């Protein structure tokens, strides 16, 4: 389990959610290994590949609720690949999951670029 300032991160997540017109209800972060993430991806999404984040959206109206599975193994390797600290990449993935709960997709080149831009804007508000 990563050492996070939960109050600071929670306040940040609530502020980002509010920018998109949402309150935060119950968001569970499940930090796991690549193997656990792959098992979840196979079982629930039918995808046979590793990924850094899987978001299950249970939101209602304007309240964000969901489970966000985050592979700490992939976060670590992604951080090394892009020259970021582990904490910086972890916060990118945390907010990526939150943005999915707001309805932001990332399947097409256009929506992926939008997601990256929104991640950057959010990360600018949180100095890690």
What are the functions of these language-model segments?
Residues 1-91, 101-128:
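An acidic/histidine-cluster motif and surrounding catalytic segment
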């Amino acid at each position: 389990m990563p050492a996070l300032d939960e109050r600071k991160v929670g306040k940040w997540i609530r502020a980002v959610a509010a920018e998109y017109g949402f309150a935060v209800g119950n968001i569970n972060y499940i930090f796991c290994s690549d193997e656990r993430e792959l098992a979840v991806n196979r079982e629930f999404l039918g995808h046979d590949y590793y990924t850094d984040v899987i978001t299950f959206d249970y939101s209602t109206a304007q309240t964000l609720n969901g489970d966000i599975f985050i592979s700490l193994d992939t976060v670590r390797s992604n951080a090394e690949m892009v020259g970021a600290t582990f904490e910086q990449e972890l916060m990118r993935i945390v907010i990526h999951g939150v943005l999915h709960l707001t309805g932001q997709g990332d399947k097409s080149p256009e929506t992926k670029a939008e997601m990256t831009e929104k991640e950057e804007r959010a990360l600018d508000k949180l100095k890690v």
